[in-house]
Swiss-Prot record:
Transport found in the keyword field: yes
Gene designation per UniProt: norC
GO function term, MF aspect, one: electron transfer activity
Key words of the record: Cell membrane, Electron transport, Heme, Iron, Membrane, Metal-binding, Respiratory chain, Signal-anchor, Transmembrane, Transmembrane helix, Transport
Source organism per UniProt: Pseudomonas aeruginosa (strain ATCC 15692 / DSM 22644 / CIP 104116 / JCM 14847 / LMG 12228 / 1C / PRS 101 / PAO1)
Pfam families in alphabetical order: Cytochrom_C (PF00034)
Induction comment: By nitric oxide.
Signal peptide limits: none
Positions with a binding annotation for heme c: C61, C64, H65
Protein name, entry field: Nitric oxide reductase subunit C
Length: 146
């Protein structure tokens, strides 16, 4: 019994595979669209978060830091900094102190510049970082310290 691969068989494989992957694409798109609002933390966005994002952009923090894996890899990841540095309660105090003592001037170590931010700007930046830390990223980026 000899079987050969015919044009009809190839056509059936092509169309069957195409339909399968189109249906798979549509199912994954539907799933993403359905779960995205739950994962973005959009409901918790406040005016302070928006102002903090503006401070982030105006001072080009992404030029050195990454946020949720996006940005430069010169300085630590800040998407998980709230959990690493005091949690919700102590983070504003930590960030105020950290921003005030910059630059550290430690020989052989990368230095963060002094941005001369006001206390309100640092608080807004802290709110932005707290908000971004609550985005469900499916544990991305995978590193702990940044």
């Amino acid at each position: 019994m000899s079987e050969t691969f015919t044009k009809g068989m190839a056509r059936n494989i092509y169309f069957g595979g195409s339909v399968f992957f189109i249906l798979l694409f549509l199912a994954l798109t539907y799933h993403t669209e359905k779960t995205l609002p739950e994962r973005t933390n959009e409901a918790a966005m406040s005016a302070a978060v928006v102002r903090g994002k503006l401070v982030w952009e105006q001072n080009n923090c992404v030029g050195c830091h990454t946020l949720l894996g996006e940005g430069a890899y010169f300085a630590p990841e800040l998407g998980n900094v709230v959990g690493r540095r005091g949690g919700e309660e102590g983070f504003n105090t930590f960030l105020q102190a950290w921003m005030n003592i910059q630059p550290l001037n430690v020989p052989g170590r990368r230095a963060m510049p002094q941005f001369h931010l006001s206390e309100g700007q640092v608080d807004d930046l802290a709110e932005f970082l707290k908000w971004s830390s609550k985005i469900d990223t499916n544990q991305w980026p995978p590193n702990k310290e940044g």
